[in-house]
Amino acid sequence: MQTLDLEALAAHRGSLFGAMPGGQPSQKAFESRVHDALSRLDPARPVVVEAESSKIGARLVPPSLWAAMAAAPVIEIVAPVEARVAHTVATYADIAADPAALDLALSRLPRHHARATISEWRAMAARGALSDLARQLIEVHYDPAYRRTGADRGRPVLDRLVLEDLSPAALAIAAQGLAAGLDRARDPA
């Protein structure tokens, strides 16, 4: 299965909490990385790309790539909130380990939420209640924002993966199944 990891190329996880050590490349360097990655892919085979906004951190996805992504069919991944919470806590362990960085990221949310909500989230972070914080962010911030943008509305759903957990092992098994399914769809013989 061919993948294009835009977050790795942009050195950013694509959210307010997405900054990575070392900072982001310049826009030109990001576009060069994207071009290099695309040039190594087989254009006759499908490419799987995580749904991203047109901006990853401070970097803009090249418009032609963004248009292709916006028109592409969708592979939905569905998981219980508890699994998503555990995955989020593990994925963002680096920012959680830096209380000042976590507080700064949370302080940037007030334009989206009431001050009391932000204060509650900051208090959760300060006392190390990271699972509670992740659950709140998923249920109150990210899921509603995703529903509001409707990024996938009207796009065909190529596959729907229902996962009970998002551990590295479960994700590897899901990726293998997805790759096999994409190969079958491409070569139905």
Model segments located where?
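Conserved NTP phosphate-binding and transfer environment spanning the P-loop NTPase/kinase superfamily
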Residues: M69-A72, V78-A189
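Short, well-ordered beta-strand core segments
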Residues: V47, V74-I75
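Short hydrophobic alpha-helical runs that function as membrane-insertion/retention elements
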Residues: L4, I75-E76
